[in-house]
């Protein structure tokens, strides 16, 4: 019984530690969503939740919206074969 609890705890921890993170990206331009208020940011939190679900979090990091706790298939910046503004 103890072994089962330890295994379940490890699986939960792995899911938490290895959750995907990254900048949300505009699929049309290939650019990150910009923000100017660094740290906790309502705009970034709202955009992350809108695009990636209720479980995600977000804040402004290096003038881009950084999302946390994303599902593995979430698309984040940089997009393959697409540079920001076509550059």
Swiss-Prot record:
Ranges where the LCN-type CS-alpha/beta domain occurs: 20-85
InterPro entries in the record: LCN-type_CS_alpha_beta_dom, Scorpion_toxin-like, Scorpion_toxin-like_sf, Scorpion_toxinL
Summary of the tissues where the protein is detected: Expressed by the venom gland.
Modified sites of kind Asparagine amide: 85
Keywords tagged on the record: Amidation, Disulfide bond, Ion channel impairing toxin, Neurotoxin, Secreted, Signal, Toxin, Voltage-gated sodium channel impairing toxin
Annotated function: Beta toxins bind voltage-independently at site-4 of sodium channels (Nav) and shift the voltage of activation toward more negative potentials thereby affecting sodium channel activation and promoting spontaneous and repetitive firing.
Domain text: Has the structural arrangement of an alpha-helix connected to antiparallel beta-sheets by disulfide bonds (CS-alpha/beta).
Protein name: Beta-toxin CsE3
Source organism: Centruroides sculpturatus (Arizona bark scorpion)
């Amino acid at each position: 019984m103890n072994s089962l609890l330890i295994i379940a705890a490890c699986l939960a921890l792995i899911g938490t530690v290895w959750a995907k993170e990254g900048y949300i990206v505009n699929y049309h331009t290939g650019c990150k969503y910009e923000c100017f208020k660094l740290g906790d940011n309502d705009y970034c939190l709202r955009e992350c939740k809108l695009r990636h679900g209720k479980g995600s979090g977000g804040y402004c990091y290096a003038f881009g919206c950084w999302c946390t706790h994303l599902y593995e298939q979430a698309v984040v910046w940089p997009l393959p074969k697409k540079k920001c503004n076509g550059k």
